[in-house]
């Protein structure tokens, strides 16, 4: 019985590994947008948190400190979207596998 249980667990782990690869590929292809001040500043980041684009409305260029804050705000918004997508994709990949409390994927 122990052998069958172990084989089942190994099969489940292999399935989870395949689902994880798929989820990671989806994350790598993901691109999300964040914006601040009604679109004065827009950023696009990848599912790997890489900054892809920054668009700044000319009206936001007058105040450097405000512009810096708007860039951070737009990036933070996009970052949160990637976090949510990552959590959703990874929870789907690990569905049915017991995970320790606080265990976060991807590593």
From Swiss-Prot:
<protein>
    <recommendedName>
        <fullName>Nucleoid-associated protein Pnuc_0701</fullName>
    </recommendedName>
</protein>
<dbReference type="GO" id="GO:0043590">
    <property type="term" value="C:bacterial nucleoid"/>
</dbReference>
<dbReference type="InterPro" id="IPR036894">
    <property type="entry name" value="YbaB-like_sf"/>
</dbReference>
<comment type="subunit">
    <text>Homodimer.</text>
</comment>
<dbReference type="Pfam" id="PF02575">
    <property type="entry name" value="YbaB_DNA_bd"/>
</dbReference>
<dbReference type="GO" id="GO:0005829">
    <property type="term" value="C:cytosol"/>
</dbReference>
<dbReference type="GO" id="GO:0003677">
    <property type="term" value="F:DNA binding"/>
</dbReference>
<keyword id="KW-0963">Cytoplasm</keyword>
<dbReference type="InterPro" id="IPR004401">
    <property type="entry name" value="YbaB/EbfC"/>
</dbReference>
<comment type="function">
    <text>Binds to DNA and alters its conformation. May be involved in regulation of gene expression, nucleoid organization and DNA protection.</text>
</comment>
<keyword id="KW-0238">DNA-binding</keyword>
<comment type="similarity">
    <text>Belongs to the YbaB/EbfC family.</text>
</comment>
